[in-house]
Amino acid sequence: MKKLIFSVLFCCVAIVASAQVQRPKLVVGIVIDQMRWDYLYYYYDKFGEGGMKRLINEGFSCDNQMVNYVPTVTGVGHASLYTGAGPATNGIASNDFRMGDKMVYCCDDPSVQGVGTTSKSAQMSPHYMLGTTIGDMLRQATDFKAKVFGVAIKDRAAILPAGHSANGAFWYDKSVAGFVTSSYYMDKLPDYVVKFNKQNTLKKGYDPKSHADGVTVTFDMAEAIMKAEKLGQNGTTDMLCVSISSTDAISHQTGTWCSPGKENEEVFLTLDRDIKKFFDALDAQVGKDGYLLFLTADHAGTHNPNTQREHKLVGGSWDKTATLRQVNEALSKKFGVEGKYFNTSVGFSLYLDHAFLAQNNLDIEAVKAAAIAELKKVPELITAVDYEKAAVAALPQWIRERIINGYYKGRSGDIYAVVKANYFDWNVKPGFYGSTHGSWNPADTHIPLIFMGWNVKPGKTTRLTNMVDTAPTVCAMLHVQAPDASTGNPIVEVVDQK
């Protein structure tokens, strides 16, 4: 009888053990700001062993990963990646957007104070983001035992990925030459951040965002967080969100690989060396099979039109300022009222001055229609679209769905200007070779997405996947609910690997 009871108990324990939710010790998200998908292969032969090559060779790559909304900019990209939602449901309409009579920054929060700095620029939180993130859902699923942190040089790149319930988010403040946070997360910096800042060799006033050493200081801070917080060693699944900002700033200044300088190559080879060191630290702390890692980008980047034209390729610039001045003059003439009909433009999103129109009893629908008619005459534009009528616009589905997915009423503009492929939204002068992003075309929307580590086998798919699929995929692998505002779907080739 005793043997029978023991056997039954053993079987019960075995069944319970096998039924336990299987999760990695740590989830790591790495976002490379303004990384084009083709950088993976353009720089492959120059990458060393153990870094980006390891990721490409050991990971599962979604080679047709696209951003499925506009605008393709940093704040929106980081919010969308981790919420699984575009601006239409997560509310982050751009880096900066208009709400009523004022412009706001996507992370501004005057109700909180900077911690580690007296700068007002550290008064930041994710309160404008209307969706939860991967980390929020992981925290909720573990009764808030999971630790979740975000780190980047750019504040929005640390804050938005980490989510609303994060244990901390740290970003770089050049005025103190170190990482800071806000009272949204904590009242004082942890001792390990204070120590890191004291040991930082970068001088006050120096901006690592514009230099390759910004990559190094970010990964070093990420490693410091990981070790001090014992991420992956707390008996539950933790999460670390890392974003590399220097790749974007340097590309804006000096361009993609197509531009004359070597700055783009320098920063991506620095990334390769530093990510190897970071992988080694992860392996040592939680084991190669102990963490689930994904690397992606918030958006890609367009080759400079000067470079394009030198090689007889398509590219150009749209002088938006001149266009809006001309359209304003045409509207003043048509409606017989002098004034400023547009009060803001953010990228390709144009905001009418609703207060001015109301004060002069001008019908907004009539003004929109007249403005669009004028914009359609501009040779650098394919067309212009009333955001609220985008669903019936005579445009390819590719463009139309991106306009719809990127529109949040009350934060986005009134009209979206559809620029030609590889066109900048300002007048590019001769001799300038920097890059930009923000538009609908594949140069800005085609980004890398590679998974590596826990429960991931090497491979790839060229099936179309979207940025908003990233969060549902990670959540499905973790067996937690997808974020609240999510509109994406799990990537079955990743989730269902056998």
Can you describe what each PLM-predicted range is?
Residues A322-N361, S435-L478, V492-K498:
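Substrate-binding rim/cap in mid-to-C-terminal beta-strand-loop elements of soluble/periplasmic
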Residues G131-Q140, G347-V385, R463-N489, D496:
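Non-catalytic, well-ordered alpha-helical segments in soluble enzyme domains
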